[in-house]
């Protein structure tokens, strides 16, 4: 499994950054390669994205969600990955968004993309675009404030 950890500081309150991140269907607006995210249920997402030039589809479950703190997920099929995004108040109106990903590169193209740092750079660029997206708006496009308790069997 490959691991990526990146963070970005955004000039919005924790609540605003967190609320925007719960709007999964907006991800294509700032995540390169993400074509579509559909929220099937409160805890299930259907993704369609281009990875290393190949279009892929998969479902992922939200395994834990605590408002203004964290959102964790794990893929169910397709590219094997899991991750967590956490939100940290630095000062009034400034939030650190930290993203941690673990993923299993599949074919040779994905392994090369991982080895060359392409995937890490894409994550950095996505976080930068998230910053531009939320700071230019100044407010979230929506919010889901529900909680998902971590399943102790995972």
PLM features: residue spans?
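Hydrophobic ligand-binding cavity/cleft-lining segments
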Residues: 1-44, 129-138, 149-154
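Intrinsic-disorder/low-complexity, polar/charged segments enriched in Ser/Thr/Lys/Arg/Asp/Glu/Gln
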Residues: 3-7, 44, 57, 70, ...
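Short, hydrophobic/aromatic-rich segments at coil-to-beta transitions
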Residues: 39-46, 65-73
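Short acidic, glycine-rich loop/turn motifs
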Residues: 49-53, 75-77
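Short, cysteine-centered beta-strand-loop-beta hairpins and adjacent loop/turn segments enriched
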Residues: 52-59, 105-109
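Beta-strand/loop substructures that line and gate deep hydrophobic ligand-binding cavities in soluble
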Residues: 63-64, 72-132, 136, 141-143, ...
